[in-house]
Every structure is written in C-alpha cells, then in structure tokens.
C-alpha cells in the first residue's frame, strides 16, 4: 500500500515569522503520518523556522532545490549534506519553474537525485509537458523521456522510495486543471515508465503526485484515481485552512 503524500510547495513566498505562524496553525490537526504524509516545501530562508516549529509533529519538511555537490565554491547554492544535517526529509527537484527560468537540464536533475540519495534524503522529482507539447500529441513521450533521464543509474531500491510529481506546465497557477482523467492518464504513464526501466514491483512502490491547480475542491476526485498517490500543491498550500483541508481529504 502506497501512503498518500500531499506536499505544499510554497515557491518564493512566506518569511520565517509567517512560517512559524503557519506551522502553529496546522501542526495539531494533521493526519497520522501512516494515513497521509503531510509535507511543506519551503524556501531555504524559511527552513530553520519550519524545522524548529514542526518538531514533534507529523509535518515533514522539504527543500525546494539543492545542488549536486555537497560543498565547495558554488556561490548561492544549497548543500544537500547540510539539508540532511538540519533535519530536512525531502528535496523537490526539476520543477518546471527551475527548468524554465534557471535552465536546469535533465542531466542536472539526475545529478541532484544522486546527491540527494547520497545524503540520505528523498527526492520529489517533477516532470510535465507544455501546452504546445500536449497539443502536438506528444505529452506521454515527453514525460516518459523526462522520467527516464531523471532516474538514470539510480538503483531499484532508490527509485522505489522516491516521489515523482507530474505537473502539466499548462495547469500550474493558471487556474486550468487537468481533468482527473487527464491527470490519471499521465500518472499511469509515469508508473509504466518506471515498470519498463525497472520492474512492476518498483513501479508499484513509487509514489506519483499530481500538481497543477490542486485545491480542496478537486483533491478528492484526483486522489480517487488509481495512479495518483498525492498532490504537489502551490497556492492552496499557503493558507493553513486550505492546507488542512487538502491533507485531511479522507475525512
């Protein structure tokens, strides 16, 4: 049984004070970690406040990015080794905003995945197609290629433990949501790609999230789908009430 995982991705929002207030507002109302894993991915500047205030609760903490080296002359980068030392659980990599604005390549994302595992953290690897690619009928091929490149040379055991987030670029922050059927269709492609690269056992264990205008109004329908194990949620994760509705979608 795959444990559902709902992760809020704050992007470049919230300061440490707001972070502390947010955690205090949600931490006593989270589902048991065995029921639904509740995660917040926060900017690096907010991680200390997030970790400090989440202590003793079921809230898991994710960084929104890291570098593929542990230390050195890499001005402005975040060390995966230090993230682990701080107590971070997950690292989001390959988000379409990182690929688009900061020119991250599939190779960069694969190197980061290896660095994250090397340091005992778990990656949440994002993939997804543009509207242009979808309209050209190439969404499935595009996503399969992204997943294949991201997982290069990872062990079966590593892949079984990671999270892959399918985020159609055309549905991020646009108010357009892929229908639950569209989301399920590509999440199934993600799982099939893992099965083709590894085997059915690994594919059955990997958790696949859908991201792209996920909100309390549509989370239940999405989570009912066979191949959708969670959500990577942007805007709706910035408000304690809506975040709690998302992570407690079973109730």
Curated annotation (Swiss-Prot):
Entry GO terms, CC: cytosol
Indicate which residues the UniProt annotation says bind substrate.
9-11, 173, 213, 234-235
Localized where? Answer: Cytoplasm
Gene3D superfamilies from the entry? Aldolase class I
- Membrane-crossing residue ranges in chain numbering: none
From the UniProt record, give one GO term of the biological process aspect: glycolytic process
Q: Which reaction does it catalyse?
A: D-glyceraldehyde 3-phosphate = dihydroxyacetone phosphate
Q: What is its EC number?
A: 5.3.1.1
Q: In which pathway does it act?
A: Carbohydrate biosynthesis; gluconeogenesis; Carbohydrate degradation; glycolysis; D-glyceraldehyde 3-phosphate from glycerone phosphate: step 1/1
Give the SUPFAM superfamilies listed for this entry.
Answer: Triosephosphate isomerase (TIM)
Q: Which domain of life is it from?
A: Bacteria
Main localization (coarse): cytoplasm
Name the keywords, alphabetized: Cytoplasm, Gluconeogenesis, Glycolysis, Isomerase
Q: Which residues form the active site?
A: 95, 167
Pfam families documented for this protein = TIM (PF00121)
Enumerate the GO terms in the molecular function aspect: triose-phosphate isomerase activity
Q: What does this protein do?
A: Involved in the gluconeogenesis. Catalyzes stereospecifically the conversion of dihydroxyacetone phosphate (DHAP) to D-glyceraldehyde-3-phosphate (G3P).
Whom does it interact with, and what assembly results? Homodimer.
The UniProt similarity line reads: Belongs to the triosephosphate isomerase family.
What is this protein's record name? Triosephosphate isomerase
């Amino acid at each position: 049984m795959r444990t559902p995982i709902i992760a809020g991705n704050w992007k470049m929002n919230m300061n440490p004070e707001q972070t502390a207030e947010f955690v205090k507002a949600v931490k006593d109302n989270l589902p048991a970690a065995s029921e639904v894993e509740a995660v917040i991915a926060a900017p690096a500047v907010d991680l200390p406040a997030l970790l400090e205030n989440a202590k003793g609760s079921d809230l898991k903490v994710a960084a929104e990015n890291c570098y593929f080296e542990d230390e050195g002359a890499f001005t402005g980068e975040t060390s995966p080794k230090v993230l682990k030392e701080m107590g971070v659980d997950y690292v989001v990599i390959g988000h379409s905003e990182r690929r688009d604005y900061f020119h991250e390549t599939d190779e960069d994302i694969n190197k980061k995945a290896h660095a994250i595992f090397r340091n005992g953290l778990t990656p949440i690897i994002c993939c997804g197609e543009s509207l242009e690619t979808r309209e050209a009928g190439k969404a499935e091929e595009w996503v399969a290629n992204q997943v294949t490149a991201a997982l290069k040379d990872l062990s079966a055991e590593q892949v079984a433990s990671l999270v892959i987030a399918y985020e159609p670029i055309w549905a991020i922050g646009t108010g357009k949501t892929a229908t639950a059927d569209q989301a399920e269709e590509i999440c199934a492609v993600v799982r099939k790609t893992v099965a083709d690269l590894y085997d059915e056992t690994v594919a059955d264990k990997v958790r696949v999230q859908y991201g792209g205008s996920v909100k309390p109004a549509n989370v239940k329908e999405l989570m009912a789908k066979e191949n959708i194990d969670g959500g990577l949620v942007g805007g709706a994760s910035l408000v304690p009430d809506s975040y709690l509705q998302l992570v407690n979608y079973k109730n």
